[in-house]
Amino acid sequence: MRFPLPAARSLSLLSFILPLLLFSLLLYSRDASAQANLPIFDGNENGYGVNGFQNYSWATVNFAATYGGSNCVSVISTTNYQAVYFGHSDFPTAAYRALDFWINGGPSGGQPVQVAGPLNGSPPVEYYLGTLQTNVWQHFTIPLSALGTANATNCSGFWIQVATGTTQTVFYVCGAQLLANPAPATVHLNVNAANVIRTADTRWFGFNTAVWDSDLDTPITSNLLKQCGCTTLRFPGGSLSDLYHWETGKTTNPVTSWATSFPNFIQIATNIGGAQVFITANYGTGTSNEAAAWVASANITNHCNFKYWEIGNEVYGASWEADSNSLPHDPVTYATRAAGYIQLMKAQDPTIKIGAVALPGEDSSNTNYPGEMVTNPVTGVVHYGWTPMMLSTFKKMGIYPDFLIYHDYPEYTSSGFNSSDSDPLLLQVADNYCPSALSDWASAAQSLRMQLTDYLGGPTSSNIELCVTENNSDAGAEGRQMTSIVNGLYLADSLGSLMKTEFNSCIWWDLRNGPSTGGDFDSTLYGWRPFGDEGITWGTTNYPVYYAEKLLQYFVRGGDSVLNPSSDYLLLSDYAVQRTNGALTLLVINKDVTTNFNAQIVLTNYFPAPEATIQSFGIAQDEATRTNAPVALQDIAETNFALATTNFTYSFPAGTLTLFTFAPAAVQLHSSSASPGKFILKYQGQAKVPYVLQESSNLLSWVSVSTNISAGAVSSLTNAVSATQQFWRVIWIP
């Protein structure tokens, strides 16, 4: 499908020597706008796209070309319909309104070109630009609606393509970007305390620990974990798990000794006070007997009661995970051996829960071993992926894991500037429902549950839970984003989105990893630290992800009721919880690092006391760290908010986590006579709020008589009257 040229605007009178100045002005206006535009290719000297856009072109291209004084992409089409393709993993476009770029026909001109924005799985709409002019930079702004990509969840980039089947001379492209939609004057946030979607799990607040961490078993680490509310730990750490032999504390290939042993881990898990523990047994180079002996040592000999055990790490990973089996990275071999692990490990301790490695998507990680395919018994479709093959093998043996293990990293940087890192898109991925990419928590959980149901069926599948034992923004080389406030925002947004799914654990990668300069430090990424690090701390330095985790302990804990609030603007996300003590907490994340957003907050089915507590961490605190301000200014800020009602407004600062804690309003009381010597105390409180009945003889000292969970209606308590009991009250105690 084509669209005529008048729908775009062409500045054909501009000379080809002007685009560098004009593009600079374009970038300046982007920074000053209410919401930042998204650069695709900004003419950087490194020869790559930015914000995760990669060179997927099938024309002859040079991403490090110059023409007329501008850094640009040169494009030569030597055969039919070749294109320069700024490709990307599926991303949402709701925040953007138009594709904007400059194009020059070069010394020959006359090339007929068209533009497309493919969506994963759908044919693209072709938008015809016409023929290019000779040595003239033309400026095009194409509405995303004209490309069929407006408000998409799965845009996979944009290409500029020669519209004929003939060879064409070189042309040039620069300044490609997505123009942002204007931010609303007021964002609307709505919280309904009656809209409960699940109960919070205590395993959501954890960290991976690693054998290379020489500071693991120290008071410093114990205090650090307690300060940020850690409830869950995983050991021994990522891909080393498939090389690690617990009895010696060494890894193989090559044989390496490490700073931290399993006894060291036992100490730290014990010292932080009853942590839930996940242990990853060695599948890649280990044996089921070795794993069973580990269970016996931990839970029988040392009485650790470590409940959760994994069989291997990312054993589907042919390019990174150790696997010495005759058929490495094979789901059938894995399930067959895992069944033996399950039997021997549970023979040592029948109370443990054992997990198997899985992936969303029925065709994910196709190993291509001959004959390995399975038909989905519900849909009748043949699939070749890891999880269907694994589950089918388990079913044949009649032996099943207790949980499936999932790891999620939205980005991957192989090295330097050739990166998928993008601050704006990272902060949109966790709650962007996108079944085609399976990059969000909801899609991943639904896919895993569907596979369990389809391939195992019946009560067997419903008894298997889903657990996340690794999560961070980037699985590759660490760059600026890792240690910036953006990763702290992502940590909170990731957990907030995960809370709305059936995933029952969330373990961040990792506690300590170490600074690195091998990742992406492009100027489009926010931040000031000259290194990246997947950990939350190093030496005496705590990164923004540490403070984000620290803040979350005041937002939600195991047993709380997870609510389902709404926001009408994707860059201001909200998550809400009703705590077991009856308080309501609201976490709001401003994902834009340049703009404050005004919001109207409406609370339904909850009446707050007029004074709330606000805790926050964001750019202001991170800047205090950069400027070496007093330590108190670098930590979570706390203020009182005296305007809490069921409908109020608030301005949320850019790049900041803001947490409201609302106490319930006071109960309404009255009394009436009952039988002689007794009276009825009537009160009306709020649903799910525990109220304490107290009595006093002098209004100075009070004695608690009973605690009652209100149903929201009028409640009656019949009390005996005595000379020593003259006063009664019903209060909420935090």
Task: Annotate each language-model stretch with its function.
Residues 665-734:
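Short, composition-biased motifs enriched in small/polar/acidic residues
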Residues 606-653:
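Acidic, Ser/Thr/Pro-rich beta/coil linker or hinge segments at domain junctions
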Residues 184-402, 406-408:
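N-terminal catalytic cores of secreted or lumenal carbohydrate-active enzymes
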Residues 76-154, 165-172, 177-178:
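Extracellular ligand-binding interfaces
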Residues 467-556, 560-574, 580:
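Aromatic/acidic polysaccharide-binding cleft in carbohydrate-active enzymes
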Residues 60-82:
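Short carbohydrate-recognition loop motifs
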Residues 331-491, 501:
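Noncatalytic carbohydrate-binding groove/subsite architecture in carbohydrate-active enzymes
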Residues 568-610, 614-617, 655-663, 674-675:
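Carbohydrate-binding surface patches
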